[in-house]
C-alpha cells in the first residue's frame, strides 16, 4: 500500500472519527480497518501519518468490543510488522526457548565439526550443513566453509548470517582470503580446534570461533595480517538477562587467549537466550565481570599457551558467547539467535559479560579474548574463525532465533530453518564484525591485541557506566528515541564499543526502522570501500543463500522467520517496512551491525541487500542468497573450490525462475500466432475514419509470440494497406465477421448483440459520413440517410432535400464523431489463414467425440482431478507426453485415475431408447440383474412387498376355491359399483380400477369371478409384486387342496369362466363413477374383512404354504398384511377361499373388496396400490399396479389419491384376463391365455413378464406352453418380498419363473396377472396403462392397452403358464374378445404375440384357441414388437403397438368402452371420450399424484409420439387413440423391434396407445371396434414417486404407474 493510499485511508478514518476519536461513521471505520488488515504497512508510512494514533485512540475510545478487538489486533499486527513487539520479555522468552531447543542441533553440529575441524576446516564446514538446524543452508554453509574458513560459517548459517559475514568480508579480496584462510585454517584451526573439540563436550556446539576467525582472518588477511591482529568486537546478543549471555560472556572470557590471538575468532556462537530470570541477570553480571576480566587478560596479550588453555576451557563457550555478542541485535533478536549457541554451551563454560559491556542492543565484547590467545595472529584468527564458524553452525540458530526472536516470530520458522538462519546469521555477523574490526581498525597484527585491549577496556568502562536496565517494560519505548539518536550518531562506536550499552526494552517503530537501516549499514562500520565490497559480497551471498533457502520465503512469517530474526534482530525483521522487504534482509546481514540504529551509514550495503531481498519474500533468505552468491564468487578461490563447486552445482541444480526471455520464448512456443490485424480507427470530426494501422500493435505481438515480432509486424504491415483500403472501401471489413458462438458466448443473436450496435454507433456514422462526403453520391447519401435519418423517405425526397438532410446529418455525425473521437474504434481485419483463429474455431466449434473423450481421459494437470506437478521443469515441457516422460511417474493407463465419464460408474449404462435393442437371449436365460435400470420402475417398499407376499400367501391359503381367488374379478363381476368401490376404496395397495370393456358383458364379472376361481391357480399371474397377495391367492388358492391341478384347471376354468367374467362396460363405467364413494365404503368393509382375512390368511397361508411349496411356492411369514388390494385380490382371495363358486366369489368379492378396503385401511404401510378395474365382461378387470406410495389409506384409498390408483389403462390385466379367459363362457380364453403366455416367450429378450422359461419367439411356443405349465406351478410361489429382485435369485419360486426376469420385465408375469371377476388372470399392471381387462367404458383406452398387454400377458401367461389365461380385457362371455384382446396384446406385446399361438395350442384348445392362433400369428410377427419393449413388459411392448394389426375402426370399437377409442370410430371415440373421460379420469387418470395422463389432459404422459402430441395438446386419449390407431397399422406393419414411429418413445412414455384392434377383432371386442389406448406414464415420472411413508421405495425399472 503506497503512501497516498495510506494517507487516503487516514483521512477517511479521521473523518469517521470526531475530535474525541469517537466513531462517527462506523461503516467508514470498518472499511478502513478491513483495508488495513488486508495490507502491509511500513514504519515510514505509520510515522508519516496519524493512522496508528487514530487506530489506537479508536481502540481506547470505542465501546464496541468487536471494533476494539480489531483495532487492537491491527495495532498488534503493525507492531509485528515494524518489529515493535519485541519486548524485553519477548527477548527473554526467546533466549530461554532457543537455549533449550538449539542444544541437540548444536551438539550434532558440534560432533560434526569436532570430527572434521582438526583435519580440515572445509570438512568441518561440510559437516556443519549436516546439522539439522541448517538443512537448506547446510550446502551453502559447506560451500562457504570450504571457500573460506571465515566464510563457511555464513554458509552453514542461514543466509542471513552468511550475508552479514559476507558484508564484513567484502573488503577482503578473494585471493587473500583464500590464502590466509587456508593457511590459518590449517594452522590455527588444527590445534585450537582439536583442543577445543577435545575440551568441549560433544553436546556443546563447537565454537565457530575458528571458522569465524577464518572468515575474519581471510578478510583480515585480505586486508592484511594487521587487521587480523585486530580484535573484533563481538556483540553478544544475549543480554544481561540471559544466562546464555552470561555463559557466552564467560565462554568468551574462557577463551580470552583465543580471542586475544584472533579477535575475529571470537564469533558469538548463537546462544539461545533463556527467559530472563533474576538468576540469569545475576549470572550475566558475573559473566560480564568475568568476561571483562577475560577480555582484559586477552587484551593484555595472552599467548598460545594461555590461548590453548582458555580455548580448552571455554573456547566453545567463548565462541558461542562471541556469536551471541556479535549477533546481539537491538531487541536482542540476534542475541536470542546467538544465545541458542551459548545455551548449547555448558552453562558452566558460559560467561556473561558485565552489564557495562552491554550496549542497549547487546553486549559488545572484543574478539581480543581469542586474539591474544593465538600465538600467530593470522594463524590464531584462522583457527578461531574456523572454531567460531563451527560453533555457530553447531549452535542451532533457530533455537536462538526462536528464543530470542519470539517477537519476530522466529518460532514460526521450523526449528531447523531457524537454526540454519541463526547459524548463518551468526557466522555472517561474526565474520562481518571481525572483518569490520580488521578493516575499520586496520592495525598490525601486533597492534591488534593492544587495540583489542583498548576496545575491551572501553567496553568494560562503557558497560560499567551503563548498567543494563531490567527489561521489565513490556510495551512502550520511552527514552528509546534518545538512545537511538545516540546510536545513530555513534553507530560505528556503538557497534564496536557498545556505546549504547543501555538495554533497549522495546524499540519504537522509529528505532526498529533505524536499526534495520543500520543493520543494512553494517558495512558503514567498515571502511566505505569495505562497505561496497561487503555489500557486493553480501549480495552474492544473499543470492546464493536465496537459492538454497526457500524456507524463509515459504513461511508466511518469512519476515519473522528465525533466519531473518537471526540475521537481524527479530525487531529489525519486523521493522522492515516490507515484511518481505530487502531492508529486513539487509538488517539480517547486519546482525552484528544491528547495534547501530542508523541506516544511513550502510546505505550501499542496505541497498544491495535490499536488491537481493527483493527477490525473496524473506529479506533474510534474500540476503542469504545474495550473500551466498557473493560468498560463492569469493569462494572461487582454490581453498573453497570444492565448496564453491558444490554450491554452484546446487544452485544450478535449482532452476531459478524463468527469465523474461525464457518465459517469452516458452510462451511463443506454446502460442499460435494470430495474424489478424486490429486497426484502430480514429474518426475525424468529419467522420472520416483514420485507420491507425497498429502494424505491430494491431497484430498483437503477444498473440504472435511464436513468430518474431518483426516478422509478425512485417506481415501486418504488408496486410495493413490492404486492410485499410478494405476498411475504407468496404465498410463490411470494419466489422469483424461474427465468430462462431460457443456455449460461453452471450445468447444475443447476430443482430441482437448490443455490443455490435454500440460498435456500430461508434464506428458506422463516421464511415457513412466519410463515404457520403467522399462519394457525394446521392445514392450514398440516401443509403446513409435512412440509417441516420429515420424520418426521411429517400424515395420521395428530392435531391435537394436529400442533400440538405445529408448535410445536416453530416453535421450531426461530425458532432457525434467529435464526441466519439475519444472512443477508439478498432477494426479487426481477419486473416482467413490465421492459425490462431483456425485453432480457436476448431477448439470451440469443432468439438467432437475425440475431443470429449480426450478431455475425459487425457491427463490435464489441473483438470479431471489430476494432480498438477509444480516441478519447474514441467514448465518447459511443450507437450504432455514430454512432461509425462520427464516425470516418468505419472501416466494415464486406463483412464481410471481421470474423471470418469458421465455414467461410467453406473452399473450399466441406461439406454434412453431401447427400441433398437433386440433381445436375442433365449427366453430361459436369466436377464442380467443389472439389466434392470435401478432408477426406473414402480416404487415399492420391500417391507410392503414382503407384507404383500405374506398377506397374499395368507389369502391364498384362506381362499381355497379358485373362483374365490378370482375374487378381484369376482368383485368386479359381482357389482361393478362394488368393484369400483374396491378400486375407489383405493386401499393403499388395493386400487381396483375396473374399467369394464364398454358394456361387453355384464355377466362377465360373474364369469370372471368364476374364472378367477379357476385362475387363482395361476399364482404367477396373480404375482404382481403389488397385487401378488390378491392375485396369487386366487391363483395359488384356486383350490388350496390341489393347487397344481387347480392351476391347470384354472387355466381351463379361466377360459370357461372367462365368458362370465366379462361385466357390462356400462356397469363398470357406472361403478367408476361411483368409485370414490363405494370405495370408501368398501374400504371400511375391506379393512374389517381383510383383518379377518389376514388372520385367516395367515393360518391358511401357513397351511397352504405347504401346498404352495408343492407348487414350488415358498411361503413367507406374513410380515404385514399387504394392503395391496389387487382389485380386492387379497380380500377376494380370502373370500374365494371361503366360497368355491364364482357366485361365492362374487359375494366374497364384495366381502373381499370390503376386506381389501379394510386391508388398505389397516395397512397404511402399503406403498402402492394396485388399481384394478373390475372386468365385468371378459374378466378384463383393468388391473394395473397403481403406485400408491402413500401409506395412508386415506390418500391411497381413492384411485385419485393413490399414486397409481388410476392407471390409465391396465393392459397388464391380461393375466387376470387369462384368468378371465379361463371363463367357461370363453373357451377361447384359454387359447388367448395360452397365446398370452407366448407373450413372455416372445419377450424372450424382454421377458419382463415372462419367466425364463418363456421365449420371446413364436417358434418356441411349444416350449412356452410347457414352460407355462411349469411356470403355472412355479407361479404359485410369488416373491412379493422381491427377494429375487434383490438377491437376484433366479427363482424366488418356481411359480415365479417369469418373475425371475425382472430386468427384462418391469414386472413379473405373476405381478402383471390378476384374476378377473371371471377368474381369468388379467395383466394387472399396464405399466403405463390403466386396467384394461375389459373394454370397459372406464378404460376403453386403458382396455385397449390392457387388452394388448393382456393379450401379451395372456400369451405370456399362456405360454408361461396355462393358468395365466390372459383374456385381454375380453368379456368372459366372448372368448373372441379375450382372444381379440390377446391378439391386441399379442401384437402389441411381442411376448404375447410370439407365444400366443403356441400357448393357445398347448394350453387350451378353446374357441379362443383359434383366436390365439391368429394372435399367435400376429405374435410371431410381433416378436420384434416385443423387442420394441426392449425386455419391457408387454404393456410396454404394447406401447410400441407395432402389432396393432387391428383395424383402426376395430380398435376404436374395442376401445370404445376403453378410455380412448380408436380414432377411426369417431362416434365410438366420442362416446368413449365421454365415458372414458369419466372412467379414465376417475379410474385411470385419477392418479393425480402420478401425474397420470388424464384422458384429455394427459400432457405429461407420452405413449407414442402421436399420443404424446395429443396428450400435450390436451386432446382426449380417444383422439389420441384415433391418431394412434392411425399409427397402429403402421406400427403393426412394423412388427420388428423398432416400434412404430411413435412407439420408440412409448417405453418411456405414459402414453395412450390403442390396443391392437386385431386382437379385439379376434374377439367380440372387434365388434366394439374400440381402439383401446393405453396410457403410459413416463418412467421418469415413476422415478419421481416418493414414499409418503418415508419408507424406501423399491423402484422397479420402467414401471409405468398408471
Curated annotation (Swiss-Prot):
GO cellular component: core mediator complex; mediator complex
Annotated Basic residues bias: 273-285, 467-477, 1101-1112
Record has GTP-binding as a keyword: no
Gene3D superfamilies the UniProt entry points to: Conserved domain common to transcription factors TFIIS, elongin A, CRSP70
Superkingdom per UniProt: Eukaryota
GO biological process, one term: positive regulation of gene expression
Subcellular location: Nucleus
Segments of this protein annotated with the region Disordered: 86-108, 238-298, 399-481, 580-617, 694-736, 1035-1158, 1372-1407
Ranges of Basic and acidic residues composition bias in the record: 418-431, 715-728, 1073-1083, 1378-1388
Coiled-coil region: 792-820
Predominant subcellular localization, coarse grouping: nucleus
Alphabetized SMART domains for the sequence: TFS2N
Quaternary state and interactors: Component of the Mediator complex.
Family: Belongs to the Mediator complex subunit 26 family.
Protein name: Mediator of RNA polymerase II transcription subunit 26
Name of the gene encoding the protein in the UniProt record: MED26
